[in-house]
Amino acid sequence: MNMKTLTETSTFRVLSLLLCFCFFIPAMNVSASSLQADKFKVSGIVKDATGEPVIGASVVEKGTTNGTVTDLDGNFNLSVASNSTIVISFIGYSDQEFHISKDNMILNVNLKEDTEMIDEVVVVGYGVQKKENLTGSVAAVNFKDVASMPVANTANMLQGRLPGVMLTNNGAQAGHDSPEIRIRGVGTFEHNDPMVLIDGVESSVSQIAEIPADDIESVSVLKDAASASIYGVRAANGVILVTTKRGGEQKPTITYSGSIALQEATVLPDYVNSYEWAKMYNECWPSKAYTDDMLQKLQNGSDPDHFANTNWAKEMFRTAAMHQHHLSVNGGSKAVHYMISTQYFQQDGILRETANQRFNFRSNLDAQLGIVKLGLNLSGSRQNIDEPTTSVTGEGLMRYLTWFTRPTVPVRYSNGHYGFLDGNPNISQSVFKNPIEALNMGYKDNKHYRFDGKFFGEIDIMKGLKFRSSLAYKYYMNDVTTFNPKNNVRYDAEGNALTTVGTNKLTDYHYLETTYINENILTYDFSVGKHSFNLLAGHSIQATRWDKNEASKQGFATDNIYEMDGGTMNDHVTGSAEESSLQSFFGRLNYNYGGRYLLEMNVRHDGSSRMPKAHRYATFPSFSGAWIMTNEKFMENVKFLHSLKLRGSWGKLGNQEIGNYAYAATLAASGSYYFGDSKQIGMKTAKIPNENIKWETTTITDFGFDAAFWGGKINVTFDWYEKNTSDILMKLAMPGIFLGSLDAPYQNAGKVRNRGWELAANYFDQKGDWAWQAGFSLSGVKNEITDMKGVEDISNNTINREGEAIGSYYGLKAIGIYRTQADLDRVNANGQKILQNNQEPQLGDIMYEDIDNNGNINDADRTVIGNPFPKMQYSFNLGFSYKDFDVNTFWQGIAGVYRYNWDETTISKGGNKTSRWLDRWSESNPDGSMPRLGGTINNNYSSFWLTKGDYLRLKNLEIGYTFRQREFLTKLGVQSLRLYLAGTNLLTFTSLDDYDPEKLSTDSRNDVHPNTRTYSFGVNVKF
């Protein structure tokens, strides 16, 4: 394993700063008691709720660092200042405060259990439940633990925090860094994103990014059918519930949090210099070779205009700043509660000429008017994204690096023009693309506007019986203006024009999405003896409309006109609109017998406009139960076991994500119909319908347990599950005579199984001024296609095939490199000499297995060579605090996974080469780890290019100090002040060189924007 980041100078600087911070802040903590002349000696004993002595309870003079801990008998002695207050605390119990006077110097303290910990609740579908009463598999994140992470996208804070939830950052381009989230594997061939609800309103993963972390109270993930089936047809991929903060009955509290951060790429490719690159090019193209004189100039740098040494990755990327400022006010009376917040966020991208700016606001209001409760949630955001007119990923700027640039060309010539040629006259400028020119050429303004509103009313009809009705409205608009200039003539180093003036073009894109949601829910809670019941019945209806419009025009007089009326030629306008609606009836029954036996039943009946009338409605039930063993009498004497709950569940879910009109015969306008001698506008069939399609259905079986040991200091959760998806909608191959030029229609044909396990454990303890915590999570899943009606779906380097995982890697099986004559003379089982594409292989070529045993390596020898699913994902956290000083670390990683690290071996269009190619095969280096350069046979997708993608990453490190109730702060009206240093992705251990190991399996060519490493300083102030 290679430790990639520790040796970087910037990291050393930051770690040094962290150490200085550790020693400097505690030194500022001058005890207020040291300034007091009069002292009282206080003594006492601390007992728990059962009368047993509490060992290690913290006894601290409030507002100071003067403190002690109770001994083995629960006793303590402490000298304090006159007229002071002491605070006594212990894990699992509520803090207690005592005012010290001459008449109150001996204390007998009985701690009371912390009811918030006992009654810890978790947000579930359409409500909350006590954690101890959950029968399904629900994981939750308290955002107090992660809110200070210096990330641009709030969703990234969830990475590694939830077992069974895999979050992958596929690049960190400013404004385009929404991660991929998969819950318990991949269940279908398309559309595997989970359902997301923010304060009960359906949203998306990308919208989580727009919520300031300081606004979020908690995030719950519903992983099994028992917990998710209440959402029916949208819940097959799991459900993420985001709950924002609300006000309470308290005086107004103003909170400010701000941070400033520096970002840099986690890793940039280690490209060879121009001299080494030119030698590689000569091996591939001897007819276009760099001469000895040219090579000499590349070595000595004597002619930088014609023989440069450019590191294009370092020219494209930079260290960039990021800062955010969040202000909130919350409070309320008995009748009215409020929480109002706003945030400003500014990020300069590490890719030059990119940036992301966002403004957010949120207002959550609650009013209690007798038996009626009213609420109003309002939130909105405005986001401006600066980006180049050329795309960054895919075939954009990142592809330029790997395929179309070479280090022998300068960024700019000395005459100021962008570089496109070097001094080798045999290489055309047409194969070169200058990414720095692309970053600076043209104009692109990408604006996003979002507004969400929800009004709800709730009435207490009678004891335990409530009715709640809500109306929500969602508005999202995206406007993109792109201008490509005409003044993009290419020149050589002497100023000669290589191309002519082009035609400029302005494109305006407009997208609008609006949604209305109405929900009506009736709940009834009642008990009969030891029998407790909770009933829920509801109805929901929602409608969504999407509008898209795009217009473009060319022929503008100058490159400074960004209005459509300024164009003179090639008008082009397109537009479309779609609508969908969903109606649902749902219900839930919770039964609790004596706090020991739990039963839950859910059912949802969904009707979707996306399905044909014959299959428009479907029902999705679930059943779950649990046994809390530790509430049984026979477990009373098992002292070390605080709680033990066994769980089991089964349920059915659905998936409607196939587009809005998959079953219908849609039409499209066309101007290609002739009547007489002229073309006329007409209508044509856009796709072939299938009125027999129905829901994709997922059933999940889950067994697990939740256990707590030694008074709740250690908590363990385990789950085993099997998730089977059937009737998967896919496009089966059909005869071309039937399809014509259209795609095949969707049919219900596939089946997929995901079988996996999850384990999580956490430990927390406290002794006096010291507290520490540790935890870990492990999970694994095996994905398998169990039925595809005998059809195979091959796409580039992946395949969907029965018995294999979705998106399995498909290519030739590499068994080495031809290094000797004996290798060249190898034969197959039939004694045939093995050719490659009917040609004799050469020394240095990659050697492939002859799968079909016909003596010739070609596409027929492709086979499954791996799959994109890791065998295990894991995380662990370690942290401690001493008085007001705290340190927390969080590590995350995956194991047992392979990623493509493919590279073009012919250098046909130029393209930078990484340093691994310095160890390529050659006559002077016959044992090289890389094949020879040149020869298209080595370009084949094969297992040779699969690299172990395991990694372990220090995802977050935070060191902080909190000033509480200091005299100098109290005078300023400050309740508390926290200063902290934090970093993300500080260390990475991996065997994958040159590229970040945290990437999607679909990134076979390393065309993705790098991820970022971040260093930040932050402050939290509460008034």
Task: Label each PLM-derived region with a short phrase.
Residues M1-R362, D366-Q368, V372-S381, V392-T393, ...:
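Short, small/polar-rich motifs associated with maturation and membrane association
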Residues P286, L298, D303, N484-D492, ...:
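Surface-exposed, extracytoplasmic segments of Gram-negative outer-membrane nutrient-acquisition systems
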